[in-house]
Amino acid sequence: MSSFEYRVTVHPAETFREIILFCSRDGACDAEAVPSGQIRKMESLLNEGGLQGWELVQASFGKEGILVFWKRQIP
């Protein structure tokens, strides 16, 4: 049976301001409104974790920032 370890990382809203705020107050969301630079920052974050063996479990977006939940198999 496989064993896993988990990690939670916190990323402040200033880092991903446009990603966090691309949904309006009435709930309308538009992925086209996210600047490409913000997408590249998110890709970089995910790729850095992946290179260390971490797999994304979930990313939770809020007004204060992003919580990213990771897991990786324990050898």
Whereabouts are the PLM-identified features?
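Terminus-proximal functional modules
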Residues: M1-P75
